[in-house]
């Protein structure tokens, strides 16, 4: 006598991630000094006396702390066949990424303290279906969907201009929107083990919204390139394949 069973499990999970990062770039302008008489390898030992040559406009010192809380509800569902093996497996992940960022940024002798709290819902749905219980290894369908959102680098919200390279100007953009992406994946595996016949097909598609990029403006009169972060829509990638053996 055949029978089918349904199983459902809904656990709650929580994870925490802490990240601390220090970075600095002291920039010195020794164009009109006698320091050119020293070998390059000797300059590091003279760092204490180099303060008077510090280019504060293009030097920065930053400290960044990130606290990430991820409460997540997970739904597991299984439809069993009469052999008590999975005929259909569904896994739905429902996490909320709550991120607290603290940035201490010093540039041009000005200290800037910024704080940002963001919360993003990044769900995922994964399914496996076995049409033939007698041929599970060579007959299965897989489906995967993921949605992700994230905020841009907090440093971009500080309004400054980097001119450390005379021919390149790097700007920030405090008005950058958040980025988002959709991913859809599909796999199909079929075969007859007795005849050593196997067919595999896969298809993956990703669509991105507000992808981060660098816009560039070139001034032909001065030869200066100006870069500024922007976001663009419509970026997508697709790859798939087919294999038979």
What are these model-predicted stretches?
Residues 1-245:
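Exposed, low-structure sequence patches enriched in small/polar residues
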């Amino acid at each position: 006598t055949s029978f089918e069973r349904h199983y459902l499990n809904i656990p709650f999970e929580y994870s925490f991630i802490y990240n601390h990062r220090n970075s600095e770039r002291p920039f010195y302008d020794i164009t009109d000094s006698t320091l050119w008489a020293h070998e390059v390898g000797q300059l590091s030992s003279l760092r204490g006396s180099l303060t008077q040559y510090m280019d504060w406009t293009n030097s920065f010192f930053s400290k960044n702390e990130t606290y990430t809380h991820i409460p997540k509800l997970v739904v597991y569902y299984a439809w069993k066949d009469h052999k008590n093996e999975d005929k259909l497996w569904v896994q739905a992940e429902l996490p909320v990424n709550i991120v607290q960022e603290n940035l201490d940024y010093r540039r041009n002798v000005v200290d800037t303290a910024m704080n940002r709290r963001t919360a993003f819902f990044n769900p995922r749905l994964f399914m496996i279906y076995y049409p033939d219980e007698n041929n599970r290894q060579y007959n299965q369908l897989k489906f995967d969907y993921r949605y992700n959102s994230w905020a841009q680098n907090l440093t971009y919200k500080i309004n400054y201009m980097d001119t450390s390279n005379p021919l390149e100007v790097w700007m920030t953009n405090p008005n950058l929107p958040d980025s988002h992406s959709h991913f859809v994946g599909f796999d199909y595996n079929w075969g007859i083990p007795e005849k050593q016949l196997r067919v595999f097909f896969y298809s993956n598609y990703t669509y991105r919204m507000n992808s981060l990029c660098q816009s560039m403006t070139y001034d032909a009169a001065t030869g200066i390139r100006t870069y500024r972060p922007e976001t663009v829509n419509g970026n997508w990638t697709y790859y798939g394949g087919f294999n038979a053996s």
